[in-house]
Amino acid sequence: MVKEYDYIVIGGGSGGIASANRAAMHGAKVILFEGKEVGGTCVNVGCVPKKVMWYGAQVAETLHRYAGEYGFDVTINKFDFATLKANRQAYIDRIHGSYERGFDSNGVERVYEYARFVDPHTVEVAGERYTAPHILIATGGHALYPNIPGSEYGITSDGFFELDEVPKRTAVIGAGYIAVEVAGVLNALGSDTHLFVRKDRPLRTFDKDIVDVLVDEMAKSGPTLHTHANATEVVKNADDSLTISFDNGETITVDCLIWAIGRTANTSGFGLEKTGVKLTEKGTIYSDEFENTSVPGIYALGDVTGKLDLTPVAVKAGRQLSERLFNNKADAKLDYTDVATVVFSHPVIGSVGLTEEKAIAKYGVENIKVYKSSFTPMYTALGDNRQPSTMKLVTLGDDEKIIGLHGIGYGVDEMIQGFSVAIKMGATKADFDNTVAIHPTGSEEFVTMR
């Protein structure tokens, strides 16, 4: 007997959860399948535990670098990593509970087993078959290991969250969000941390002026940055340390190696070949602007599509899809332009819109005007442990429409959301100029640039 539903969701990560709940709220009969813990990468081994670790690193920086400058005589007896890890997991468990209550409230059925396609409209789970006219694939992605000898001795970002103590010496290899964030956290928590990147700098998709500030701060406070370094071999030593060799002749011996070289879509192991769904050249599932795959009635969103691997993107795309399918909003879709993002580095980076480099490439240098301001945030300005901050606006044309806003520094992570609304609405430099600043704050720099 085949069980019939209106909507089948394969994958209980951020996108799948959001779409399932929204569909059920509109009266659809929904069932969700997830073979691991609900919440996907973000909640379990991604942005949520990462942010907890970043907060821990911020506390460490406050105690060691800034407390004395504010007159506090602080003696640190010890740092109990086990306490941080246990409290982090307890927080994640509470999120799991919140998800379950949401499912119950909205009437979303769920089976915590892996689903496998039998045909384009039927899946099989634990011997039972389920069918629906609409099936969403939201299976996410997973971290990659390089194809070099000894790569198995390293761990990925998933393994980072399994650590029981802060390694004495750590090598993080990669140049994206995850690499920069993990390296920054471990450095702040006391590990002798080295970040290796293949090219001239990390975060190459971000504005160069902003990244240059981060690189300068790394040179001053860590982690140690190594550029133009491609790992070629990893050897495990008798004392369990690891020696890593690079193609530039460099070697380093560490206690922990973390690979953060990228992620790839989860497209195998659930019978996708039975559906006829097409993949892109990168191995992700092709989906159009409405999240339709190449097969009618099958949809895909989130990391499995490789569009923008950000949790809020998957959540918004999932909700918009359900609005279209189950609430008669035929044009509902996610606008993938001007999506704000933050890197929880030290100091933090925020960005929305085009970088200066991309703006010039798209519109021509003669049509672009850039405004920039650099300063020391007040919080770090009382003593010698000063952190830099740089804010930047990229404008287009005579009316100076703001097409890019970028910043690095204390509090930027909480500033960027509000400014992204203004940019989404088409704000100009004049609009910013006509806004009265809040003083003293870092955000006032964005509305007082000349």
Question: PLM features: what roles do these ranges have?
Answer:
Residues 151-167, 251-328:
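FAD-site-proximal beta/loop scaffold in flavoenzymes
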Residues 8-18, 22-36, 41, 48, ...:
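Flexible, glycine-rich terminal cap/loop adjacent to redox cofactors
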Residues 47, 137-192, 224-225, 273-275, ...:
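Glycine-rich dinucleotide-binding loop and its adjacent helix/turn
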